[in-house]
């Protein structure tokens, strides 16, 4: 064995040495034809059933291999006498009974100490009476259990057509291939001889029974018990089984002969040329057995080939002779080659040999059971085994495709890869996930069938397989050396979106994902994170899922630095992620963390150290293929025999893959070395005076509405001290915005005009229909255009000679907006920036209530259908009014493609934009049909202005006049405010009360002398203070007023006028916080006085007090909103040279991310050219639109209907002159390609500004030195290419390749200031 001398004693140096030894071990295990394979370990049942079979068939004998099998079986017995399903699990009753019977057949006497211990274990655990169905089935074939104790399994099942809800193809592939031979065996009901003779009531195992006199144990509960427990499906299947038993199992039924012939034909059709059936022991063994019972000669070709396939599963090693459940050459080869690609071996001839071996095994065949229900008929998958053409494996196919691309990126568009991708996409289930072998195979009710006590009859979508496919799709979408066509990209993005939605539903409360095919939560979680990592930067929901998971991984790390998990976590969820450390679990956890954290993270370094310290050289021997090689091999690996980390069927069958403990650590070490090597390259720090200006992301806040609306946004922006915030709003709010220290941008318009246009009280839909909304259109169009200008400064007008923050060109990095600012998504899309919507009113489609903007009365509509339609109607009329303007704006100002009405109705609502709702769930809970991107954050705590102090006269009024009611209508427009005040005063006089009126809503009356004596008029007063001194609150139902009243615990009378005021009025009444709402348009003295009396009664006190207590326990919604905005900011990629700066550029050749300053320096130094750089979007909106665009026929029909309706409506409106020139945007589309990209030009100018600013902060010598250091750093980083980018000629990861030889020393270079 070669010696490995490590001169670098750092963790990185040790990791390089460990990786080199692991790679050497891998190459030493490679087969001459290029592939890898290792034995698939499992429990003793397969070996025991192999013994049963050889004992049953006269032509077979156990004389030669019996002693070695006996030695292996006895060696697997545990100290308590049992046999387990896996090394770290307690004994299993069924496995122990089967192993015991096999040993008795092999001649071990029942008086042997090992057998006595086994007997004691079985009896202690309920005896043979408690074994599972398949064990009972095998016992019946020896007369140890009567056949009447076995459920009926009529062969006629195979005759049921595929369109029926029950047929053989609704079963999983493994269940189907195992069940059909069982149908034949069940028909024949054989009874074979045992060493004590042949008998239908054999007492050979009586010592294992608790009550040997009663062996006809029912396989299901009595029918009456099932009825009492409301187990209807179990009842139906059990009743059917009883009926079938009455008719002798239909053995003499006219169709039985046809069914038996079809079973036999099916088996012959599904036998591979090699003799295999599904490459799995149960169908191979069962098919040979069934065909022999059906009359086939043992010397026949089909039986001979089948026996060869069966014997290929046998393994002989130092422990003895045993039988694998299956073989895994394609799986082992794909995973190993994939790992070696990550280790930098792409392009190596040995790896090329492996990938060629994989290409040769692609299943381009015309048969396969998957064809019955798949969404495609294009073949192209890969199987798990050597010979299994009927059941390609989705999981294997994904890994093979990734391996082929990593080894040679030029093959991305090859027929081999594209056929595989086509087949893989066709296997996606309706729920968005993937199963392993079948599509939409989720009929879990089949597990209620009496013979399904292993819960393995279906192959539903699982998180681990879906995560792997998502990883494959992400890799395909990232390719630049051989990029996919737009059509393929669209298909992959749409498929990925469905997969991400599926994974969001499957994530558990801990943040982890259940692992179906590997142990367990660590496996499932690692697979999912490997997939989500490709989409986390552009998909907020994917990012949120990932962030939730990382803390769970931290919490499950063991004290020794590794990770592990017991298989008992499949039974007991409290054990999820817990167990003795193993190499595989540690590697899975590290792979997950390394995709989101720096390699210097403490948890990562401890995990890497565990892998290094637990690596072992091969001294005693190793598996070369499935054969044991004695002596030392080359390299080193990790121990694999102490834990099974693969899963066949949870709680029933677990698998030990030796290479799992080897190849996954290779990937983890490779990723660590790659990231640590990149981190070790010197990083440059810009002068602090420049950093203050440049290291501040630009946040654009678009706001429309009243003073109260703006106050909410101001509360949020106070949490963004690390950002440069620009608030674009009406000129009326300029003083308030600038008074809080934020940049103001004037977009025009007036909240008073908006309020007046909608003050009719009939809702926004009625306003649009009646034409009253028309007067706002021109004003709003102007405002919307101004919002875009606010997002992108005219950079030509900025001079770097003024190094204050406000002089730097403003280009929005994040856009924040309320839902009413309809242009927000267009501006964010053009700026390639993420969007955060902050709302004080429900604006998302739901069936729980209608759109608040369409409500014209204080009452919720019970129709969920109408409620959803109301949101679509609002979107329809909104698009009718502004859609053409938006499209002209998109074409002429934004340089974006036109959109249609179907986009507004069906697509925008599906985009996963973070939507922060600033109200409390105590008042308005989150509807169940809202997605995870919607956050009900809680009310924002309004900060009262310091100059709003109560006067002494007001305080005296409050003390002397009891009870007092506060009255405020915000900034609403009231036609005759004095008349309203006098009306309210009269009502209050009737109930003996006074009022404090806040007149911020109207200043048209001045003379206080005209006011009634029971009215006190104030210009401005903090609601938080005032409401503590009054007994009731009358207001218009604005979100802020409703919140203030609820927080104060005071009863409220709401007088809604328009928009969402009716929604909050209804909520107040619904929650018992005040009287029935009284709309302003229905205000009469006779109605008002009783409401005032009701308001001042004590009937609402308890509900109001409880609500106030609940709200005090809520977090501040402004904090949640601020955190969400900062999360979007933090997600922006950082520059690889100046890590303090955001990277808005990337090099198309190397994918390295660059800040504007670094890019400008490299361009000025002629290292690169601007055409070598592309803008790196902080959010890829084009991908978002393609992802959400549904291709289902139903949605296509709806789109067509909507477009026809829209075309008809716009034509009619055009005839009346409403919409003039509304289709001019089509010319804009034609002109779009010719115009210069304004964003790119702005970023280019900004980059030059930033570099100039940094140069100004340096002295002349440092400025020259800075450019030289940038060039040096750039060249070093080009030699270290990130793992995910495989676009150099060989496809190799240079960082991994170089990591085996050496790396760069860590250093940080500070640029000297003047």
UniProtKB/Swiss-Prot annotation:
One of its GO terms (biological process) is triterpenoid biosynthetic process. One of its GO terms (molecular function) is sterol 3-beta-glucosyltransferase activity. Residues 1-680 are annotated as: Terpenne cyclase. It holds the Pfam family EryCIII-like_C. It is a multi-pass membrane protein. Disulfide bonds: none annotated. PANTHER family: STEROL 3-BETA-GLUCOSYLTRANSFERASE, STEROL 3-BETA-GLUCOSYLTRANSFERASE UGT80A2. Residues 1289-1314 are annotated as: Disordered. InterPro entries: EryCIII-like_C, Glycosyltransferase_28, GlycoTrans_28_N, Hopene-cyclase, SQ_cyclase_C, SQ_cyclase_N, Squalene_cyclase, Terpenoid_cyclase/PrenylTrfase. The lineage of its organism: Eukaryota, Fungi, Dikarya, Ascomycota, Pezizomycotina. PFTB repeats lie at residues 19-62, 66-107, 260-300, 417-458, 546-597. The record marks 331, 384, 517 as: Transition state stabilizer. Residues 1292-1302 have a biased composition (Low complexity). Disruption phenotype: Abolishes the production of enfumafungin and loses antifungal activity. It comes from Hormonema carpetanum. Terpene cyclase-glycosyl transferase fusion protein; part of the gene cluster that mediates the biosynthesis of enfumafungin, a glycosylated fernene-type triterpenoid with potent antifungal activity, mediated by its interaction with beta-1,3-glucan synthase and the fungal cell wall. The pathway begins with the terpene cyclase-glycosyl transferase fusion protein that most likely uses 2,3-oxidosqualene as substrate and catalyzes glycosylation immediately after cyclization. Residues 681-1314 are annotated as: Glycosyltransferase. Keywords: Isomerase, Membrane, Repeat, Transferase, Transmembrane, Transmembrane helix. This is Enfumafungin synthase efuA. Pathway: Secondary metabolite biosynthesis; terpenoid biosynthesis. Its EC number is 5.4.99.-, 2.4.1.-. The chain crosses the membrane at residues 133-153, 155-175, 230-250, 1200-1220. Its main location: membrane. In the N-terminal section; belongs to the terpene cyclase/mutase family. It is found in: Membrane. The gene is efuA. The active site is at residue 395.
């Amino acid at each position: 064995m070669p010696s490995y001398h490590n001169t670098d004693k750092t963790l990185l140096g040790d990791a390089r040495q460990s990786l080199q030894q692991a790679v050497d071990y891998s190459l030493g295990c490679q087969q001459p034809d290029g592939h890898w394979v290792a034995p698939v370990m499992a429990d003793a049942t397969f070996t025991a059933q192999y013994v049963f079979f050889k004992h049953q068939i006269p032509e077979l004998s156990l004389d030669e291999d019996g002693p070695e099998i006996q030695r292996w079986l006895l060696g697997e017995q545990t100290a308590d006498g049992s046999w387990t399903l896996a090394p770290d699990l307690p004994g299993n009753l069924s496995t122990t009974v089967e192993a015991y019977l096999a040993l008795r057949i092999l001649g071990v006497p029942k008086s042997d100490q090992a057998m006595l211990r086994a007997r004691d274990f079985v009896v202690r655990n309920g005896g043979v009476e408690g074994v599972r169905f398949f064990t009972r089935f095998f016992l019946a074939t020896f007369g140890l259990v009567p056949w009447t104790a076995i459920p009926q399994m009529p062969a006629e099942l195979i005759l049921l057509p595929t369109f029926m809800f029950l047929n053989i193809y609704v079963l999983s592939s493994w269940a189907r291939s195992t069940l059909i031979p069982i149908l034949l065996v069940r028909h024949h009901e054989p009874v074979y001889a045992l060493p004590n003779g042949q008998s239908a009531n054999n007492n050979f195992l009586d010592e294992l029974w608790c009550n040997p006199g009663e062996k006809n144990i029912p396989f299901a509960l009595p029918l009456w018990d099932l009825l009492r427990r409301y187990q209807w499906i179990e009842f139906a299947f059990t009743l059917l089984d009883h009926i079938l038993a009455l008719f002798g199992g239909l053995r003499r039924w006219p169709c039985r002969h046809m069914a038996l012939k079809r079973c036999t034909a099916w088996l012959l059709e599904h036998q591979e040329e090699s003799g295999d059936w599904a490459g799995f022991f149960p169908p191979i063994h069962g098919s040979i057995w069934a065909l022999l019972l059906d009359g086939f000669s043992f010397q026949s070709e089909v039986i001979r080939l089948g026996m060869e396939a069966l014997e290929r599963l046998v393994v002989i090693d130092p422990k003895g002779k045993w039988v694998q459940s299956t073989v895994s050459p394609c799986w082992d080869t794909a995973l190993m080659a994939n790992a070696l690609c990550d280790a930098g071996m792409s392009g190596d001839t040995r790896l090329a040999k492996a990938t060629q071996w994989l290409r040769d095994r692609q299943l381009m065949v015309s048969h396969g059971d998957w064809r019955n229900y798949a969404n495609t008929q294009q073949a192209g998958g890969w199987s798990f085994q050597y010979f299994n053409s009927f059941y390609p494996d989705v999981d294997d196919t994904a890994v093979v495709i990734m391996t082929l691309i990593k080894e040679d990126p030029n093959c991305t568009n090859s027929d081999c890869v594209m056929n595989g991708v086509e087949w893989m996409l066709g296997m996606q289930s309706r729920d968005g996930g993937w199963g392993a072998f079948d599509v939409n195979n989720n009929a879990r009710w089949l597990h209620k069938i009496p013979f399904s006590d292993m819960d393995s009859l279906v192959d539903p979508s699982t998180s681990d397989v879906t995560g792997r496919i998502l990883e494959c799709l992400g890799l395909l979408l990232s390719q630049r050396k051989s990029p996919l066509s737009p059509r393929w990209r669209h298909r992959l993005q749409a498929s990925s979106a469905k997969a991400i939605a599926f994974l969001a539903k499957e994530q558990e409360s801990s943040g982890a994902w259940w692992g179906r095919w590997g142990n367990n939560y660590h496996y499932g979680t690692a697979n999912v994170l490997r997939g989500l990592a490709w989409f986390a930067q552009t998909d907020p929901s994917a990012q949120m899922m990932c962030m939730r998971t990382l803390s769970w991984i931290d919490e499950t790390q063991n004290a020794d630095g590794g990770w592990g998990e017991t298989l008992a976590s499949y039974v007991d969820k409290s054990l999820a992620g817990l167990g003795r450390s193993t190499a595989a679990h540690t590697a899975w956890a590290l792979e997950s963390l390394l995709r989101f954290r720096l390699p210097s993270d403490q948890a990562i370094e401890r995990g890497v150290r565990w892998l290094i310290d637990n690596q072992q050289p091969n001294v005693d021997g190793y598996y070369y293929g499935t054969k044991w090689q004695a002596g030392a091999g080359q390299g080193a690996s990790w121990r694999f025999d102490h834990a099974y980390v693969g899963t066949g069927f949870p709680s029933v069958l677990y698998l030990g893959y030796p290479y799992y403990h080897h190849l996954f650590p290779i990937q983890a070490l490779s990723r660590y070395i790659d990231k640590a090597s990149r981190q070790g390259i010197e990083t440059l720090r810009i002068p602090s005076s420049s950093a203050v200006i440049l290291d501040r992301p630009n946040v654009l806040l678009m706001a429309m509405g009243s003073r109260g609306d703006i106050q909410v946004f101001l509360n949020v922006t106070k949490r963004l001290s690390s950002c440069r915030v620009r608030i674009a709003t009406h000129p009326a709010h300029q003083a308030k915005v600038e008074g809080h220290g934020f940049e103001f941008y004037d977009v025009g318009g007036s909240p008073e005009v908006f309020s007046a246009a909608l003050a009719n009280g009939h809702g926004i839909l009625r306003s649009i229909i009646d034409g009253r909304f028309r007067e706002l259109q021109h004003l709003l169009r102007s405002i919307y255009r101004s919002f875009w200008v606010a997002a992108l400064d005219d950079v030509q007008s900025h001079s770097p000679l003024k190094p204050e923050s406000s002089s730097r060109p403003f280009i929005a990095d994040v856009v924040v907006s309320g839902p009413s600012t309809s242009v927000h998504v267009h501006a964010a899309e053009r700026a390639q920036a993420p969007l955060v919507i902050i709302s004080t009113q429900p604006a998302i489609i739901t069936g729980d209530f209608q759109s608040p903007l369409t409500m014209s009365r204080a009452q919720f509509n019970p129709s969920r259908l109408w409620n959803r339609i109301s949101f679509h109607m609002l979107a329809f009329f909104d698009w009718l009014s502004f859609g053409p303007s938006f499209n002209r704006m998109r074409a002429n100002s934004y340089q974006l493609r036109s959109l249609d009405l179907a986009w507004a109705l069906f697509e925008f609502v599906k985009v996963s934009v973070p939507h922060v709702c600033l109200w409390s769930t105590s008042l308005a809970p989150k509807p169940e049909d809202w997605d995870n991107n919607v956050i009900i954050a809680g009310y924002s705590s309004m900060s009262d202005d310091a100059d709003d102090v109560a006067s002494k006269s007001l305080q005296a009024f409050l003390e002397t006049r009891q009870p007092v009611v506060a009255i405020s209508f915000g900034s609403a427009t009231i036609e005759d405010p004095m008349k309203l005040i006098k009306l309210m005063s009269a009502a209050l006089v009737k109930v003996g009360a006074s009022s404090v009126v806040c007149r911020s809503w109207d200043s048209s009356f001045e003379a206080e002398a005209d006011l009634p004596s029971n009215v006190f008029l104030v210009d401005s007063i903090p609601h938080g203070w005032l409401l503590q001194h009054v007994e009731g609150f009358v207001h218009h139902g604005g979100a802020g007023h409703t919140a203030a009243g609820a927080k104060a615990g005071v009863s409220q009378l709401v007088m809604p006028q328009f928009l969402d005021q009716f929604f909050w009025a209804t909520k107040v009444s619904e929650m018992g916080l005040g009287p029935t709402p009284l709309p302003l348009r229905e205000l009469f003295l006779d109605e008002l006085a009783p409401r005032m009396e009701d308001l001042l009664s004590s009937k609402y006190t308890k509900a109001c007090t409880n609500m106030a207590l609940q709200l005090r326990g809520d977090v501040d919604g402004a904090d949640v909103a601020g955190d969400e905005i900062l999360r979007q900011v933090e997600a922006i990629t950082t520059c690889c040279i100046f890590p303090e700066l955001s990277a808005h550029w990337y090099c198309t050749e190397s994918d390295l991310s660059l800040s504007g300053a670094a890019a400008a320096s490299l361009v000025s130094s002629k290292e690169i050219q601007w055409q070598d750089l592309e803008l790196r979007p902080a959010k890829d909106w084009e991908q978002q639109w393609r992802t959400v665009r549904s291709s289902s026929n139903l949605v296509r029909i709806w789109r067509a209907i909507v477009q026809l309706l829209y075309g008809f409506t716009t034509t009619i409106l055009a005839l009346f002159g409403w919409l003039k020139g509304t289709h001019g945007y089509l010319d804009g589309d034609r002109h779009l390609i010719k115009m210069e990209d304004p964003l790119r030009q702005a970023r280019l100018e900004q980059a030059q500004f930033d570099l100039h600013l940094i140069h100004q902060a340096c002295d002349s010598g440092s400025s020259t030195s800075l450019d030289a250091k940038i060039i040096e750093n750039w060249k070093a980083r080009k030699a270290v290419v990130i793992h995910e980018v495989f676009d150099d000629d060989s496809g190799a990861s240079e960082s991994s390749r170089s990591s085996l030889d050496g790396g760069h020393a860590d250093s940080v270079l500070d640029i000297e200031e003047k």
